[in-house]
């Protein structure tokens, strides 16, 4: 019985750790040298614009602003919002609810 409980605890911790790792995953690290705004600053700006929990984050080339932006998926009140922050100016470029088929 003790082995079964220990196995359940280890499995739960493993699953939780996997979730935390997924939330902290970052795409676009190769573009960081081109940005003037750090990931931490961009995260703070995104959360100030739309408080919640960041579930996905990336740095990408995209039209609008200077062409380089951090994109954050933020879970809030049961919905997912996409918040874009210009990676060179720090300006919030986008703050909208995602549709039924998010990126």
Segments the model singles out, each with a brief description of its role:
Residues 2-103:
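Long, terminal "pre-/pro-" and other extracytoplasmic accessory regions
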